[in-house]
């Protein structure tokens, strides 16, 4: 309702009040107006009104006054306004009575009531809009979305669990209650199917035993995961035969059995199901080798450095060998010299036509031993004269006495000629001036030999 229309309505109501008073006193107005005013006298008693009916009647009054202003008929507008005011007496009784004094203050009071109603309606609309906005904000909040996702995940996992359990073996009851325990396993149906498979019915929720320590309490505390088997998943490693599977995050772990529409049954091994559901996780050999260490790059660097250090040590140990070989003469030169020496030994030893290296060397060794024994035999009488070392001299004498005959025989067999001492006067110095006039010989006279032979 516009402010201009309200002022116009107030003016019209004032005119209506003045015309009604003049018509009741003078009786000079229009007959229709006179009949309306005379037939229905105004009473000062209380009239029960409602703000809703008042607003409806005010709208009728505005329409009537606008129509009469266009026709420029003031008398008709006064009569219509009187008839509209007269209609207030026919309103039903409501909850609260309101006194109706027919003056300008009453209309102002009702106008205030209308304003209060409009304010209340606008406030209720704004509160309703704010409530709707708050409700939408609550729906869009991450807490509600997480809760809805968790509920959907629970429903989906329960359906998958029922499907896999029903495909694997019969179950009494549903998944909403706990799985059949020892009390329910004694039923006839469970006993009848007990011989067909060797599975064990768990009596507790598996998801309560397989909660990960690495999962945060804010994100995944309310999610129940049946068949989240805690073998080596939450340690970050899964072994599939001899193949090392890389670590999973929480979402991949929760969706292990969901990619093909059913979870693995209890009878099948876990890695067999992984071979079906995770073919894309077969990694290269280099990646598998990197997964054995917590820090692959640092371990590879350490291995490379270690290999380089070992190679450097081996090279350092091999260098002196190479230098020693280079310092020696070539192999051909050594072979030629050895051949010449072997030929010289063959001429000295004369191994009876044997020209091979082994026989020549054996004959040379035997000849050297023979020469050593002869030197020892000839030096025995001279060693007796030295009294400084009696122990050693006695040992030598005993050895010479034991092998005297054998050695002499050996010398004779070898063709050694023994010269008599009389003939060796130039050596011993026993004779006169013979033998070059040398008075003293090179060798002293042995004590046991007194005369010549």
Swiss-Prot record:
Keywords: DNA-binding, Nucleus, Transcription, Transcription regulation
Protein's UniProt name: Transcription factor bHLH110
Top-rank taxon, per record: Eukaryota
Disordered: annotated span: 1-37, 177-197, 386-411
Organism: Arabidopsis thaliana (Mouse-ear cress)
GO molecular function list: DNA binding; DNA-binding transcription factor activity; protein dimerization activity
Domain named bHLH: residues: 322-371
Keyword DNA-binding appears in the UniProt entry: yes
InterPro entries registered for this protein in UniProt: bHLH95_bHLH, bHLH_dom, HLH_DNA-bd_sf, IND-like
Subunit composition and interactions: Homodimer.
Gene3D superfamilies referenced in this protein's UniProt entry, alphabetically: Helix-loop-helix DNA-binding domain
Gene Ontology terms: cellular component: nucleus
Compositional bias segments (type: Low complexity): 8-32, 177-192
Signal peptide residues on this chain, from the entry's feature table: none
Principal subcellular localisation of the protein: nucleus
Compartmental location: Nucleus
